[in-house]
Structures are given as structure tokens and as C-alpha cells.
A protein has these predicted regions:
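N-terminal secretory signal peptides that target proteins for export/translocation
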Residues: 1-13
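Bacterial N-terminal signal peptides
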Residues: 17-28
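Cleavable N-terminal signal peptides
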Residues: 31-32
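Histidine-centered copper-binding motifs that mark active-site loops
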Residues: 35-303, 307-311, 346-388, 459, ...
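Active-site pocket scaffolds in enzymes
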Residues: 85-86, 128-130, 136-141, 145-147, ...
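Short, conserved beta-strand segments of beta-strand-rich sandwich/propeller modules, principally
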Residues: 113, 164-166, 260, 321-323, ...
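Terminal connector regions
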Residues: 125, 172-176, 182, 317-351, ...
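Short, surface-exposed loop/turn segments at beta-strand-coil junctions that are enriched for proline
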Residues: 156-162, 313-319, 464-471
Length: 493
């Protein structure tokens, strides 16, 4: 535990005292998630179904490099005022004037130069979530960019990195606030030898949520209020759900058509349990790219920070519709469980056109080889015990190194969730493979950088610290939790 003079510790103490009072009150009032309508008020004009609008992908960052093997872009974070919901405008922070930010389109082997400018009134960073790049370009809290300052992020995309990633700020104590204000965007990395047909239409789905006051402003309550205490405990969830910054957009498909969907969970805390009415998914990729073999699913659970690649085959009759929903998922402590946690929420509509059916697409059964990390080469097994707001009983201290290891080492991490709510665990800088959950071997070998650890469960993973030394973060990816100290520092030498 850090000293009592640490601001994080003082805030955490206030929040815990507040929650102690709330938990006592829960014995005589409904659960804390069952607050009145004012806590979940929608802006004027936001009620009722939105007019049908086609799904729009965020525009791509413009590459200004003359060299075909270099991607050079300009990215600026600035205050802005945008319309996020019907009938209102909202003060936001935006990358290049849009929410979500523009998509960074890359290829394996690219040298990447991002000229970043911070026009915000506060320090910020840009964290390239999931990318295996030098620590100096990771955008961690160690490298803040001051208001008005510029910083160049320079890195190379390695072979085998093709997949779907995202970027967001990572300043100490301020990540959740800045993401809630609108700072997040997607990264798509392509491989020259992608095994999936290039003819497949591709959709990018960035899932997010937010909460608004009646005047359209973003609801960010003080931590010592009732709603602020709930946000601290649960992580901040919104009552408006977005796909690419849109409410309930529409995707059109021909009967029989197969589309490739790249899905990013950019929410601060919400877990999406995705299902498309009348359909199954072919799950073909995760955080670190494609699997060896497709896996057919009726639903997919995606924790915040995780990504997925899905193949969706249109099976509906011409003129009909299907709905992509997030189904009930109980990740909460019972006393702070929202009253509507068990209600499905609509995300996106699929409209089947009257065009002639699409001829069946031929899809490969083998996508790529995913080599297993060798458990016999693990030089250590480390236990990471997740409690409320702490890892191994300690809160984050930027002056302390929690784990030291040598460059090139392979280790096993045992992530133990000691409390009654889920914690998604994220490791910066290195992809890992999940070995087992509660002693049950993982069915699909895949590269991950974020893994959900459900309440009172244990996940074992294996990681190899290759190529890049330096200091790296590991933390719960519920943003209010990481902001209040549920993080640690890994140093690779």
C-alpha cells in the first residue's frame, strides 16, 4: 500500500467510506444500481428509436509518407463540441475532430510515424493497445504529453501482427475521464498473405457506451456521490450504446452473403455478450489476430479492451431484418448491480436486401499456424491476485517496480480474482496465450493482450518477453479501477 499522502490512496479511502455507507443502506433500499431515472436521464430528443441510418466506418488517418513502406500520419487531441445523440450537442475531447477517432490503417512491415499534438487543457498520452512496440512509444503513464506539446510515436509493425487493435489515452488517474470524453479509435493491421478472401465485405464495429445529463453533457459524477460510488465499484457504464458513434445503425446484406466484422470493445467497463438473432458467428480472430481454425458460436462475450474478428453469413430471407444485441451478463457485485443488468440491448440492425442471393463463399478451414509457447521453458510462475482496487494487495506506485524479468524469458502468470465481480486483465507490450481457466485447458490457442477473469475464477497464461526491454504496465481494464490504482509495473531488462 502506498503512503497516506498519495492522492490515489486518499481518493480510494473516500470512495470506500462512501461505499461502506451505501452497502449498509442496501439492506433497507433496493440495490444501488436501481437508482432513480435522474441518474440515467437521456438528453432531450434521445428517447425513442433513432431514425434508421447506415453504419458508417470512421474515416482513416491520411498517410502522407511518399515511401510505400512507411505510414506517416498526424493525430491531434482537442476539445470540441459534437452531436453524439439526437437533439443535443456535447462538449467532448476528440481525435482530429471526430468521435470515435480516425482509424489507423497499417500493414505488416510498415514503419509508422504518428505526429501527435495535445491541444487539450490537460496532459495525455496515446496508448496503442495490444501493439508489440518499443516501451518509449507505448503511450503509458511514464510518458505524458503536456498541454500544447507535440510528440512523435515511431514504431514498426512486425510480421504476424495482423489483426484489430485500438488506441486511447493512458495518463495516470485520467484514462477513464478522457475516454468518456471521446478519445478512442481503431487500428487495423493487414497481412499480405491474409487467408480470408479479399472479396469479403468488411465492417468495423467499435462498441462504446456513455451516460448523459438532460442538457446533453456527459455525466461524470464526483466519486463521493451515490452514482460516483457506483461507478467506482462497477466501472462506469453508459445508458446510451454506440456502434462507431452511432445509435442503432443498419448494415445491409444480401441473403447468403458473408461479411467480415472487426469488433472492438472500447467501453470503460461494459462487457458485451453479442448475439445476432437467427444466426451463428464464425469466430476467426481475437486480440492478436487470426486463430488456426474458425470456431462456430451462437454468442460471443467481449470484455472491455478485447477485440474479435467474426465472419457473419446472412441467413435471413430478403426484406427481413436481424438484430445484433448484447445479452444479459452479470459481472457485478450484487449490491451495486444495475437494475436493468438482465435486459438485452439492441446495438445494430441487419437489413436483408431484395438483391439476388450471394453465391456461397468458400472459406478456409485452416487460417494460420499459431505456435504454442513452451511451458517447460517458463522460468517463473507469478501469482497476480486481483482484489477491489489492488493487485497483490498493493495500489499503483509509479516509483515502484512490481515485477522484474529478463529479456527473452518465458513466464506463467496465474491471475486470481478474489472478489465477486469480473476484472479484465491487460498486459502492455506483449501478447500472451491463455493456458487454462479454473484448471480447464483453453480450447482455442490464440494471441491475447486482454483477458476477462470472472468473479472468483483463476486464469493461467504464458508470456514471452521478446524484443523490447523497458517498463510496462499491467492492470485491470475497468478504467475507473486502473485510474484508482489497480495497476502494476513490469520491468524487462
Amino acid at each position: 500500500m502506498t503512503s497516506s499522502g498519495n492522492p490515489t490512496c486518499r481518493v480510494g479511502l473516500i470512495v470506500r467510506l462512501t461505499l461502506s455507507i451505501l452497502l449498509v443502506a442496501a439492506t433497507i433500499v433496493p440495490p444501488l444500481g436501481a437508482q432513480g431515472d435522474s441518474a440515467h436521464a437521456l438528453p432531450r430528443g434521445a428517447n425513442g428509436p433513432p431514425p434508421a441510418s447506415p453504419l458508417i466506418s470512421p474515416r482513416a488517418l491520411e498517410d502522407v509518407a511518399p515511401d510505400p513502406h512507411t505510414v506517416e500520419v498526424y493525430l491531434t487531441a482537442s476539445p470540441n463540441r459534437l452531436s453524439l445523440v439526437r437533439g443535443s450537442t456535447t462538449d467532448v475531447y476528440a481525435y482530429n475532430g471526430q468521435v470515435p477517432g480516425p482509424t489507423l490503417q497499417l500493414r505488416e512491415g510498415d514503419r509508422v510515424i504518428v505526429h501527435f499534438r495535445n491541444n487539450l487543457p490537460v496532459p495525455t498520452t496515446v496508448h496503442w493497445h495490444g501493439l508489440h512496440i518499443p516501451a518509449s512509444s507505448d503511450g503509458s503513464p511514464f510518458h505524458p504529453v503536456a498541454p500544447g506539446a507535440r510528440h512523435d510515436y515511431v514504431f514498426t509493425i512486425l510480421r504476424g501482427a495482423a489483426g484489430t487493435y485500438w488506441y486511447h489515452p493512458h495518463p495516470h488517474h485520467q484514462t477513464g475521464y478522457q475516454v468518456a470524453k471521446g478519445l478512442y479509435g481503431a487500428i487495423v493491421i493487414r497481412a499480405a498473405d491474409d487467408p480470408l478472401p479479399a472479396s469479403l465485405p468488411e465492417k468495423l464495429l467499435i462498441l462504446s457506451d456513455n451516460r448523459f445529463l438532460p442538457d446533453g453533457s456527459i455525466d461524470l459524477p464526483d466519486q463521493t456521490t451515490l452514482q460516483g460510488g457506483i461507478d467506482f465499484e462497477n466501472g462506469r457504464e453508459g445508458n446510451v450504446l454506440f456502434v462507431n458513434g452511432q445509435v442503432m445503425p443498419t448494415v445491409t446484406m444480401r441473403s447468403g452473403e458473408v461479411q467480415r466484422w472487426r469488433v472492438v470493445n472500447a467501453s470503460a467497463a461494459r462487457v458485451y455478450r453479442l448475439a445476432l438473432t437467427g444466426h451463428t458467428f464464425l469466430h476467426v480472430g481475437s486480440d492478436g489476430g487470426l486463430f488456426e481454425h474458425p470456431v462456430e458460436l451462437t454468442e460471443l462475450t467481449l470484455a472491455n479492451g478485447e477485440r474479435a474478428e467474426l465472419l457473419v453469413r446472412a441467413t435471413g430471407a430478403p426484406g427481413t431484418r436481424a438484430t445484433l444485441q448484447t445479452l444479459a451478463y452479470d459481472r457485478y457485485i450484487p449490491q451495486t448491480r444495475p437494475k436493468d443488468w438482465n435486459q438485452p440491448r439492441d446495438l445494430l440492425a441487419v437489413q436483408y436486401t431484395h438483391d439476388a442471393p450471394e453465391p456461397p463463399a468458400t472459406l478456409p478451414n485452416v487460417l494460420r499456424h499459431v505456435p504454442a509457447l513452451d511451458t517447460t521453458r517458463a522460468s517463473a510462475t507469478r501469482v497476480m491476485a486481483l482484489s477491489q482496487g489492488m493487485i497483490n494487495g498493493r495500489m499503483m506506485d509509479v516509483s515502484r517496480v512490481d515485477v522484474s524479468a529478463r529479456l527473452g524469458a518465458t513466464e506463467i502468470w496465474q491471475i486470481e480474482n478474489l472478489v465477486g465481480m469480473d476484472h479484465p486483465f491487460h498486459l502492455h507490450g506483449f501478447q500472451f496465450q491463455v493456458l487454462e481457466r479454473n484448471g480447464v485447458p483453453e480450447r482455442v490457442r490464440r494471441w491475447k493482450d486482454t483477458v476477462n477473469v470472472p468473479k472468483h475464477e483463476t486464469v493461467r497464461l504464458i508470456v514471452r518477453y521478446d524484443r523490447y526491454p523497458g517498463k510496462w504496465m499491467f492492470h485491470c481494464h475497468i478504467l475507473t479501477h486502473e485510474d484508482h490504482g489497480m495497476m502494476g509495473i513490469l520491468e524487462i531488462r
